[in-house]
Regions:
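Auxiliary alpha/beta "docking" domains used to position bulky ligands
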Residues: 1-141
Length: 141
């Protein structure tokens, strides 16, 4: 029996949904949208564990508290089949280091100049996820 992925109808639907998802991501201002399998980086849990154990997470206690599910998405959602990753450059248009040459001018932290990037990105992710779920007839977490 053929694998489901070899079925031309399934491949076409997958490819159509991938194009739709990437288009929605770009429309919401994301620079990158990639899709992979949940086990595509088998060393991820160990790397994250070592990072946290070395104290590199600083004061972000939530990283230690959630390292199991962050290291393996199947811990969070056992039925997961794909992982979607987004990237967005939320930096300023101008190089903030240019102000270093002008010590008589005040410099405001890049992160304090605009809306909190957590809120911006989260809102845009929710928009992409809502549209994708409606198109695909699927659940999104």
């Amino acid at each position: 029996m053929d694998e489901p992925q070899s079925d031309p109808k399934i491949r076409k639907r997958r490819d159509d949904l991938t194009r739709f998802l990437r288009g929605e991501a770009l429309a919401q201002g994301f620079d990158v949208c990639r899709i992979t399998l949940p086990d595509s980086i088998p060393e991820a849990p160990g790397r994250l564990h070592a990072f946290v154990e070395a104290g590199r997470h600083g004061t972000m206690a939530w990283m230690e508290e959630t390292k199991e599910r962050r290291g393996d998405p199947r811990v969070l959602w056992s039925d997961v089949r794909s992982i979607v990753m987004f990237g967005m450059n939320y930096g300023p248009d101008e190089d903030p280091r240019l102000l270093q040459a002008e010590p008589d001018k005040a410099a405001i932290s890049v992160y304090a100049r605009n809306r909190d990037y957590h809120d911006v990105i989260k809102g845009r992710l929710k928009e992409v996820a809502t549209r994708f779920a409606a198109k695909a007839g699927a659940d999104v977490k």
